Each structure stands twice: as C-alpha cells, then as structure tokens.
Amino acid sequence: MITGKLITVEGPDGAGKTTVLEQLIPLLKQKVAQEILTTREPGGVAISEYIRELILDINHTAMDPKTELLLYIAARRQHLVEKVLPALEAGQLVFIDRFIDSSVAYQGAGRGLIKADIQWLNEFATDGLEPDLTLYFDVPSEIGLARINANQQREVNRLDLETIEIHQRVRKGYLALAKEHPKRIVTIDATKPLKEVVSVALEHVLALLLA
C-alpha cells in the first residue's frame, strides 16, 4: 500500500530543474520529518542506468524514435518496481527527476509519436501510478540551450545534438500538458533567479504535504 507522496520534476533541457532539486531538498529536510528519496529517469537503478547509457550515447544517432521511447519505458518500469514503489510503500517522499510527462513531451511533441500510444505505454509501465505533484520548470528554448552551451563541465550527449525546432516542440508539449493537468502540474518560471525559483518550488511542495 502506498503511503508516501510522489513528486516529479520536469522541464526542457537547460531549465535548471536538477540544480533546483539539489537546493530544494536540504531546505525541505529542515521543515519535514518524512524521509526523502531523490532519484532520476532514465536511471536510478543499475539496469535503468545501463539503458540510460544506451539512450544518451553520442554514437547512437541512428536510434529510431520508437526504439528510444521503448528504452525509456523499460528503464521506467525497472526503476519503479525496484526503487520507487518500495520507497512509496515505506511512506517516503519521493522526488523523480523526469517521469511520464517527459515521454509525452519529448517522444510525443518532440519526435512526433502518437500521444495515445505513449500514454498507454506509460500506464502499462507504471500500472497507472501518477505523481501527486509535478513541478514543471519552464524556460524558452533559446535560453535553455544557451545555458547548456555555457556549461563547460557538462558532457555532451546525443540529445544535445537536436535542433532548436525539436526543443521548441518539446516545450510546447510541456505547456500543453500543464494546461491539461492544472491540478497536478504547476508551472514555475525558470528564467527567474535560482533562489526565487527554489523558493516557489518549496512553497508548492509544502502546500501538498500540509494539505
């Protein structure tokens, strides 16, 4: 039985969501006694991390969009049963850096795959599990890509080679999802100063936990 809460973190490339999450968790630990787990997709467990390497390998430019989607779905399933569900059943507060919405935004809006097919695969992989809250960090594609290019410490992966048009379609896909699920997805302006973005995210998380 699930007694914990699931919060997912989403955003286009360069939105800074991972950095926000790194700063958010220590602040949250000062305010709640609940045990907190942070993890990521694709990855989080050994099998899923191996799949992550396949997906992001810069040499795999011939990867078909459906192959890419199915790899993400496989990684999602293994991660869920091995790590996420046990934590939720133990009453933990679980944060996942990317989840079901990423597939709809990237492989759906970005790659042009059929949304209904992606939603079916998501439901198949998760047994219908949905986040209690999704923090969507929004940033224009031009700003996001500029941030990525400015980060010299970040290793370039296959997805960094995509055109700005694909990144723009991904963002539009996310914005459409936010309109479709207004009770679950909160949109946060990620162009604001980092401290302000973290503060807004913290407010939304605490509102969920104290509801």
Curated annotation (Swiss-Prot):
It catalyses: dTMP + ATP = dTDP + ADP. Gene3D superfamilies: P-loop containing nucleotide triphosphate hydrolases. It is an enzyme of class 2 (transferase). ATP binds at residues 11-18. One of its GO terms (biological process) is dTDP biosynthetic process. GO terms for cellular component: cytosol. GO terms for molecular function: ATP binding; dTMP kinase activity. CDD domains: TMPK. It comes from the Bacteria. Keywords: ATP-binding, Kinase, Nucleotide biosynthesis, Nucleotide-binding, Transferase. InterPro entries: P-loop_NTPase, Thymidylate_kin-like_dom, Thymidylate_kinase. Its EC number is 2.7.4.9. It holds the Pfam family Thymidylate_kin. Phosphorylation of dTMP to form dTDP in both de novo and salvage pathways of dTTP synthesis. Belongs to the thymidylate kinase family. PANTHER family: THYMIDYLATE KINASE (PTHR10344), UMP-CMP KINASE 2, MITOCHONDRIAL (PTHR10344:SF4). This is Thymidylate kinase. It comes from Streptococcus pyogenes serotype M6 (strain ATCC BAA-946 / MGAS10394). The lineage of its organism: Bacteria, Bacillati, Bacillota, Bacilli, Lactobacillales.
